[in-house]
């Protein structure tokens, strides 16, 4: 079954097929979000094949942002808590692209590809805090075997910090 969904431009004075000025997105949760985030979210669900803009006219900036999206690659924005070292930057924006390991965990997505590339680099401990959903971490020198692994938390229990084991399921 081929599926499609609508996203909304946030450009001023857009319009649709009827007198509605609040946008015409399929998912209410997308209202007022940047258009590229709406599109990336729909593709990330893996339930939508085509995405259409439901109101006219999207701005040139919105169209350009959408044109850069590859439906087959999950991308998301990151807000940094600290300035990255050169090695951390290279791991985060790994040129080979990140891929979730085959031994999937319900608690995190793990990309171990950078581990081999950066095995001889030092990654100092920084910002070790309890994790919450959506946090991105790079394992450091204290976890030498896993140093350089990039993790994105899907679900984490209070009191758990990276490298101290996964909590048992509830």
Residue ranges with predicted function:
Residues 1-82:
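Catalytic alpha/beta core domains of metabolic enzymes, predominantly
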Residues 83-170:
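C-terminal functional modules
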């Amino acid at each position: 079954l081929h599926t499609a969904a609508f996203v909304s431009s946030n450009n001023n004075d857009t319009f649709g097929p009827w007198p509605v000025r609040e946008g015409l997105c399929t998912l209410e949760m997308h209202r007022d979000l940047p258009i590229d985030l709406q599109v990336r979210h729909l593709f990330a669900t893996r339930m939508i094949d085509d995405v259409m803009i439901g109101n006219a006219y999207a701005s040139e900036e919105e169209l350009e942002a959408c044109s850069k999206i590859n439906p087959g690659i999950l991308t998301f924005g990151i807000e940094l808590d600290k300035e990255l070292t050169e090695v951390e930057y290279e791991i985060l924006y790994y040129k080979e692209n990140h891929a979730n390991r085959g031994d999937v965990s319900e608690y995190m997505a793990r990309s171990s590809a950078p581990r081999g590339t950066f095995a001889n680099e030092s990654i100092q401990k920084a910002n070790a805090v309890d994790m919450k959903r959506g946090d991105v971490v790079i394992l450091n020198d204290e976890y030498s075997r896993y140093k350089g692994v990039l993790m994105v938390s899907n679900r984490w229990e209070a009191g758990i910090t990276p490298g101290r084991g996964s909590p048992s399921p509830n």
